[in-house]
Amino acid sequence: FRADSPVFEVELPPEKQRQLENLVSDIENEVFNASDSLGWTYQYWQSKKKNEINNSGNKVGDKELPAVTQLFTEPYMVEYLIDNSLGAWWANRCLKKKYLSSEISETGLQERISLPNLNFDYLKFEVDDNNYWFIPGVDNILGWPESLSELKVIDPACGSGHFIVTIFLKLVPIRMEIEKLSAEKACDLVIRENIHGLEIDQRCIEIAAFAIALAAWKYPNAGGFRKLPDFNIAWCGQAI
C-alpha cells in the first residue's frame, strides 16, 4: 500500500483483531509461499461486488468496470504461454542441431535447457518428417532481440501480476546464465529493463508491485529484503 493509504487509518476492535489474526495463523504455509495468493484473495473479495453489479441490470460505468472485468489467469495457463514464448527463445538458443536429431524424448530436451530455479515444463516439442525434434513456439519469437537487456515484456491488463511475476522468475536465471550476473543484479535488471504492466484497478497495481517485490526479496542469494528499482507498472485509470 502507499504510505498515505487510508487502510493505515483503520482500527479494529481487539476481539475482531484477534479473530483476524487467528484466521491468518491458520492459513497453510503453501498459501503464503505462492506468489499469486494475494491476487486470488482480492478476486474473491471482489466477487460479491461483481455479482451485485451484474445482477443490477444497470449500465456498467468506469467505477464498476474493474470489478466486473476482473478475471485472473490460472497458473498453468500463465506457465503454458510463457514457456512457449520465452521458453521457445531459450530452447532455440540452447539446443544445437545434434540434440534435436539425437535426443529420444521430450523430457530429455527439457532437461537440457533447465537451470537452477528454472524449468519449462509446458514447452512443447514436436517431431518432423525426418524424425528431428523442432520447437513449434519458435514462430512466436520472430523479431525478438538477441540481447535480453533489450526485451520489453508488457501485460496491458496485468491485474495483480500473475504473468509478470512468473516471467520475472524465469528471466532472472536466464540472464544470470547468459550475462554471468549475480542473482541480485539480475533481479534488478529484469525489474528495470524487462517487465512492464498496466491496469485499471488501482488496488491490483499495488498488489502486483508487492508480488514482484516479494519475488525479488525471496529469490535465492538476491540480498533478501532491500530497496529495489522502480517498477515499470502503472495504474492507467479509466480515461481511455
Where do the protein language model's features map onto the residues?
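Non-catalytic nucleic-acid substrate-recognition regions in nucleic-acid-modifying enzymes
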Residues: 1-40, 48
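Short, charged low-complexity linear motifs
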Residues: 23-30, 58, 116-119
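Generic structural signal for hydrophobic core residues of well-folded globular domains
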Residues: 27, 44-49, 85, 89, ...
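P-loop NTPase catalytic cores that bind/hydrolyze ATP
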Residues: 32-46, 83, 203, 207-210
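Short coil/turn segments at secondary-structure boundaries
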Residues: 32-40, 52-61, 93-96
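Extended, well-ordered alpha-helical segments in internal regulatory regions
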Residues: 48-52, 170
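SAM-dependent methyltransferase catalytic region
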Residues: 59, 63, 67-240
